[in-house]
Amino acid sequence: MPDYKSVVVSTTDKKKNKKKKKENAALAIVKGLIPWKGDSVGEIIRKIVFLVSIVALCVAVLIIIDKYMFEPERQRNEYQSSILQLGNHEPTAEEIAELPEKAINTEYAPFYAINNDFVGWLSIKGINVNYPVVQGKNNTDYLEKDFYGNYSKNGTIFADYENEFKNTGETSANTILYGHNLRTENFFAEITEYRRVDLDKSLEFLKKHPVIEFNTLYEKAKYKIFSVMLINTREEYGDVFNYPAILNFANRDEFNYFTSECLDRSEFFTGVDMKYGDKFLTLSTCEFEVGLYDMRIVVVARKVRDGESDSFTDEQIKSFKRNPDTKQCRTIRELYYYGKEWSGRYWNPAWIEGFKKDSSFKTESSD
């Protein structure tokens, strides 16, 4: 007859032995890490140095995490809070008196009083784009400097240093605004939503936010988006559209070149018409999604004319569509278009007043 009692005792002993081995192993690890009774002086010093190193490493990791994850977030919140407070501040007579001659938008006087580089205010309804715009002596002044002149990796939204903002309200034909889109999700972070790899999703975003407002000290204006582009800036990738160099048009040919290139390269068509003499607003920010260096997302909008509606009708928004074949640099064509050559233009030449249709247009051009 089996001795069940001995079997139970044997099993219990095995469990106790396993538990004891685990405890001994844990104790051995602890003894190996911290000074213990019976350790030699050299062993104690070694363990102390090791523990200090571990603590220093942990502190360094926490500092790095704070610097790159939490500090930018704090900077964003503090910056936006200060800008909001400044915007809610009623301008004083002294601040208004400091404005340039013929400035009419006195609500911006507090911003100009703090920073004379202030040239306007940019906003897009429904998204986190609602910021002051500055203009430096060059296009690097505000890359890592906030509105108050303090160091910030977020920088500030700034106008091209060669853009003109006259006290008559006149501006350059093409006003270019640059901004970062870092992980803090401010400035131009949401501008990247206009051009994601998921273009259908971006089209829906465009339909919800098709109008940009940019007010200077001398006028208030709205702009209708007609082009959303992915732009290459490196010659090694092939075709480069040097849009930052185009601030004015010497003649109709230069105007036609700029507007037609914007339509050729646009991911979407919104049907906005253009004519020589129109003014444009261009938003430019870095692009990181396609996997190439120095790519840009560029959004171009045409200024609303006198007497024109400053919004799109529901019917117009429904007609927004994707470009069947976007003009891109060689490397993008190789990566995303199976190496196929650009097939030609699918936009309506009537969108540019006086533009002549030629063989580059496809028969399926948009209405």
Give the predicted meaning of each segment.
Residues P2-D13, K18-L99:
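N-terminal membrane-targeting segments
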Residues V59-D367:
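Solvent-exposed, non-transmembrane regions of membrane-associated and secreted proteins
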